């Protein structure tokens, strides 16, 4: 499921630079995550980077957008067409993912 940022966000900005897909941006009142760019860090980390750095734990799974690991790795490959390493890891089914902990 895509991650979203709750209204508890304190606008510290810690999450934005951690996102490998540039899915996080500053919204009108709080930071927001574009679900079309969010891969839950599948292909990059075995955890969601935004969740790991958020001091108020407001980066949460969005229960309205449930996605499989396969969908998320395909999105990561599509978003990073020039990342040969990511493509190799995806093809070999050997990439970091929170689903594989």
From Swiss-Prot:
Specify which residues bind [4Fe-4S] cluster 2 according to the UniProt entry for this protein: 19, 38, 41, 50
InterPro entries the record matches: 4Fe4S_Fe-S-bd (IPR017896), 4Fe4S_Fe_S_CS (IPR017900), YfhL-like (IPR047927)
For this chain's record, the cofactor binding note is: Binds 2 [4Fe-4S] clusters.
Keywords, alphabetical: 4Fe-4S, Electron transport, Iron, Iron-sulfur, Metal-binding, Transport
A GO MF term: 4 iron, 4 sulfur cluster binding
> Which residue range or ranges hold the 4Fe-4S ferredoxin-type domain?
1-29, 31-64
Give the PROSITE patterns listed for this entry. Answer: 4FE4S_FER_1, 4FE4S_FER_2
Could you tell me which Pfam families the record lists for this protein?
Fer4
Q: Which residues bind [4Fe-4S] cluster 1?
A: 9, 12, 15, 54
Record function comment = Ferredoxins are iron-sulfur proteins that transfer electrons in a wide variety of metabolic reactions. Fdx2 can receive electrons from both FdR_A and FdR_B ferredoxin reductases, with a preference for FdR_B compared with FdR_A, and transfer the electrons to the cytochrome P450 CYP260A1.
Protein name in UniProt: Ferredoxin Fdx2
What organism is this sequence from? Answer: Sorangium cellulosum (strain So ce56) (Polyangium cellulosum (strain So ce56))
């Amino acid at each position: 499921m895509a991650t979203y940022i709750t209204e508890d966000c304190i606008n510290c900005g810690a999450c934005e630079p951690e996102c490998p897909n540039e899915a996080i941006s500053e919204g009108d009142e709080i930071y927001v995550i574009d679900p079309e760019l969010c891969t839950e860090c599948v292909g990059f980390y075995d955890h969601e980077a935004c969740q790991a750095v958020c001091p108020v734990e407001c980066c949460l799974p969005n229960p309205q957008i449930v996605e499989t690991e396969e969908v998320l790795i395909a999105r990561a490959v599509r978003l990073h067409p020039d990342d040969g390493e990511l493509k190799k890891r995806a093809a070999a089914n050997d990439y970091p993912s929170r689903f594989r902990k």
